[in-house]
C-alpha cells in the first residue's frame, strides 16, 4: 500500500486526480453524520480518502523538512538563528494540541476543522514564500521548486479535508489566521530577509507536522476504531 501511494503522489497531476475522483464518487452518495451507521460503500470510500490524505500529509511534512534543511544549510550556517528570539508563528492563534496524546481527546470533527484552518492560513503565506524567495542571494531554484510542490500539496490536502467533511455531513466552519510577514521578506536588509524566511519555513514545518499528526488521529478514530 505504501509503495502504491508513493507512486500515486509522484506527480502533482496524479495526486490531484485521486482527490477529484473521490469527490466525483461522493456526489452520488448521500452524506451521513459521523456517528450514524454507514453502509459499506461510504465506509470504504472514507477509508480510502483518509488513507490517501494522511499519507499525503506525511509526504508534505517530509518535503517541508527537506526545504528547511536545505535553506538552513545554504543561508543560516554560522548565523546562530536558533539563539535569536524567534517570532511567533502566525498560526499561534489556534488552540492546537501539542502532541498525539492531546489530539486523541479531540473529536474527529474538531480536528478536521483545525486541520482545515491551518491549511487555509498558509494559502497566502505560501504564495509569497514562492514569489519572494528569488530575492535571496545565490541559486534559489531548488528551494523554489520544493516550495511550489509543498504549496500544490497543501491545496490538495485542503481539497481532501473538505471532501471528508462533506462525506460525514460536517458543516465547514474553518477559519484562518492572517499572515503579515511580507514586509520582512521584502526588507532591504539581507539578514532580516534571511531570518524571516528561516522563521517562516520553521513555522511551516511545525504546522505541517501538526497537520500530519491530526490526520493520523482522525484516521485512527474514524477508520481503525470506526467510532466518533
Curated annotation (Swiss-Prot):
GO cellular component, one term: extracellular region
InterPro entries, per the entry: 4_helix_cytokine-like_core, Somatotropin/Prolactin
Signal peptide positions on this chain: 1-31
Molecular function as annotated in GO: hormone activity
Compartments, as annotated in UniProt: Secreted
Tissue distribution: Expressed specifically in placenta. Expressed at high levels in trophoblast cells from both junctional and labyrinth zones of the chorioallantoic placenta the last week of gestation.
Pfam families referenced in this protein's UniProt entry, alphabetically: Hormone_1
Family of the protein in this entry: Belongs to the somatotropin/prolactin family.
PANTHER family for this protein: PROLACTIN-2B1, SOMATOTROPIN,PROLACTIN
Name of the molecule in the record: Prolactin-2B1
Amino acid at each position: 500500500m505504501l509503495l502504491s501511494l508513493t507512486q500515486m503522489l509522484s506527480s502533482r497531476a496524479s495526486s490531484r486526480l485521486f482527490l477529484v475522483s473521490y469527490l466525483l464518487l461522493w456526489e452520488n452518495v448521500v452524506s451521513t453524520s459521523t456517528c450514524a451507521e454507514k453502509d459499506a460503500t461510504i465506509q470504504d470510500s472514507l477509508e480510502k480518502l483518509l488513507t490517501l490524505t494522511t499519507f499525503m500529509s506525511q509526504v508534505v511534512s517530509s518535503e517541508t523538512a527537506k526545504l528547511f534543511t536545505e535553506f538552513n544549510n545554504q543561508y543560516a550556517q554560522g548565523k546562530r538563528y536558533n539563539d535569536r528570539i524567534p517570532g511567533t508563528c502566525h498560526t499561534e492563534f489556534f488552540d492546537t494540541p501539542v502532541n498525539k496524546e492531546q489530539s486523541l481527546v479531540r473529536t474527529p470533527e474538531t480536528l478536521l476543522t483545525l486541520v482545515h484552518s491551518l491549511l487555509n492560513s498558509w494559502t497566502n503565506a505560501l504564495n509569497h514564500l514562492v514569489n519572494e524567495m528569488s530575492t535571496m542571494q545565490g541559486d534559489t531554484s531548488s528551494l523554489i521548486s520544493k516550495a511550489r510542490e509543498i504549496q500544490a500539496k497543501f491545496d490538495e490536502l485542503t481539497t481532501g479535508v473538505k471532501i471528508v467533511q462533506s462525506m460525514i455531513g460536517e458543516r465547514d466552519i474553518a477559519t484562518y489566521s492572517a499572515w503579515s510577514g511580507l514586509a520582512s521578506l521584502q526588507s532591504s536588509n539581507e539578514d532580516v530577509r534571511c531570518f524571516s524566511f528561516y522563521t517562516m519555513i520553521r513555522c511551516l514545518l511545525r504546522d505541517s507536522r501538526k497537520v500530519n499528526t491530526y490526520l493520523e488521529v482522525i484516521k485512527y478514530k474514524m477508520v481503525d476504531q470506526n467510532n466518533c
